[in-house]
A protein has these predicted regions:
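Class I Rossmann-like S-adenosyl-L-methionine
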Residues: 1-187
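Class I SAM-dependent methyltransferase Rossmann-like catalytic core
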Residues: 18, 190-197
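Glycine-centered loop/turn positions within well-structured domains
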Residues: 142, 204, 216
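Conserved hydrophobic/aromatic pocket- or pore-lining residues that grip, position, or stack substrates
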Residues: 144, 198, 206, 222
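Active-site proximal loops enriched in glycine and acidic residues that flank catalytic Cys/His/Asp
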Residues: 148, 181, 200, 222-223
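Glycine-rich helix-loop-beta junction characteristic of Rossmann-like nucleotide cofactor-binding loops
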Residues: 188-189, 208-214
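Conserved class I S-adenosyl-L-methionine
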Residues: 215-222
């Protein structure tokens, strides 16, 4: 999905940074809530499509009032999406404003996992099931690995701060920084100069636990 989004933006370089961020949040939000959005669309009698999911997420996931959404789409017919059709306006107005989740949703839909996988996860996670699945519904943190050949964590943190990007030390890896908020890390000089790379802190820990020494050959086997 990230490659599709990046390719779409590459073909539309006129889109500003704020709009890029807003569009990205919409796309990722819809992906994280696909099952729940589908459930809501069925409740209000709407056909599932990319557009209907975005409209539903704008109301259910971002708290936009249906009336405000109607006015917003009617105010910019040149660059914005097409105004709502009468049928779209009908079902959008039926959407509640209390969020994506509902007590009537089956567990697999509420937790955004296939039924068969939910059964297996319940067996393996037991009492931690709900906490783990709730975490998967949240945006992932942006972790960075400091390149020790070029910098140290404190120096890399200062370099990023100079570009307006605040970070905090990782909790476990001595080489990790975690971005506070979402920022275009790849556009920073610190990233271009190789001071940091984007890498999950868990992956950094795996690399440390292998005990790799200079001269060793490593096979990075990714399932």
């Amino acid at each position: 999905a990230d490659r599709v989004i990046a390719g779409w933006f590459k073909q539309r370089r006129f889109i500003g940074s704020k709009d890029r961020r807003a569009i990205s949040e919409l796309v990722w939000g819809c992906l994280r809530a696909t099952a729940r959005l589908g459930w809501w669309l069925r409740q209000v009698g709407a056909a599932e499509s990319a557009r209907s999911r975005v409209l539903a997420f704008t109301v259910l996931g971002q708290g936009e009032k249906p009336e405000s959404l109607l006015r917003l789409l009617e105010s910019d017919t040149r660059y914005g999406p097409q105004p709502l059709s009468k049928e779209e306006a009908r079902w959008v107005k039926r959407l509640p404003s209390h969020g994506l989740s509902h007590s009537d949703q089956p567990a697999a839909i509420a937790w955004e996992v296939p039924e068969w996988l939910l059964v297996r996860l319940a067996q393996s996670l037991d009492q931690d099931l709900e906490a783990e699945l709730a975490a998967l519904q949240e945006p992932a943190a942006v972790d960075l690995r400091v390149n020790l050949l070029k910098s140290r964590r404190r120096e890399a943190r200062r370099a990023l701060a100079a570009e307006g990007i605040e970070t905090e030390p990782g909790r476990w890896s001595p080489h990790a920084l975690r971005s506070i908020g979402r920022h275009p890390i790849a556009a920073t000089r610190a990233y271009r100069d190789g001071l940091v790379e984007i890498q999950d802190e868990g992956s950094q820990l795996i690399a440390l636990l292998t005990g790799v020494a200079p001269g060793m050959r490593v096979c990075d086997f990714c399932a």
